[in-house]
């Protein structure tokens, strides 16, 4: 069996440009992470934990490591990181860790869709923060998650393996919507797409504070 860990790439809201006052976070949205054989999950988790300890020691050399401490990917891989001594050490440590994924029989996963450029009014004809805009953002998230699941199922089928999927914790209303949509997508596609039988359940959600592998998916995303 394969185990997949994924996290969101960017955010699903509107995007205008990187220098726009409000809509400047990300021109794409999707999911990224890694897939690894079940028998290598524990070993790789220990390697991720060690890398996280290394990150902590780079940034807080005089302090004791805190197991629930997180190093967010957005902070880790930021502009100019390689030009700073601590940032360079982190990037090189992350590179060394990710090289161990294929060595463990796993694969990196990355899927994004480019957003239509414009404010919510320009793209959807709705005001920022309005119910219509929130609904559009939720729909973008659900469609991208469904496509990520489709692609992970295809990968699992190519490997002749079943798969389980884990992602970072989100709020309860979002979780319920995503689980319901994921089940609907999986079962609706099964008749014509046999690879969908490879995924045994809809995604499960784990807090990245508690799961080293979910933390690693965040670094990749």
Predicted segments, located by residue:
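Phosphate-ester processing/binding pockets and catalytic centers
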Residues: 1-221
């Amino acid at each position: 069996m394969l185990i997949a860990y994924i996290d969101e790439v960017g955010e699903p809201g509107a995007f205008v440009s990187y220098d726009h006052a409000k809509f400047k976070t990300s021109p794409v949205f999707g999911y990224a992470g890694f897939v690894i054989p079940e028998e290598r999950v524990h070993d790789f988790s220990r390697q991720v934990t060690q890398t996280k300890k290394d990150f902590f020691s780079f940034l807080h050399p005089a302090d004791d490591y805190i197991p629930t401490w997180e190093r967010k990917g957005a902070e880790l891989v930021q502009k100019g990181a390689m030009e700073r001594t601590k940032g360079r050490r982190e990037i090189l440590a992350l590179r060394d860790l990710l090289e161990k994924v294929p060595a463990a029989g796993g694969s990196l996963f990355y899927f994004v869709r480019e957003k239509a450029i414009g404010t919510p009014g320009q793209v959807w004809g709705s005001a920022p923060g309005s119910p219509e805009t929130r609904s559009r953002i939720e729909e973008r998230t659900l469609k991208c998650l469904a496509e990520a699941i489709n692609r992970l199922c295809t990968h699992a089928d190519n490997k002749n393996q079943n798969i389980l999927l884990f992602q970072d914790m989100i709020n309860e209303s979002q979780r319920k919507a995503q689980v319901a949509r994921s089940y609907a997508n999986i079962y609706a596609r099964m008749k014509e797409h046999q690879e969908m039988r490879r995924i045994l359940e809809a995604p499960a959600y784990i807090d990245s504070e508690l799961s080293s592998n979910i933390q690693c998916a965040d670094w990749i995303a």
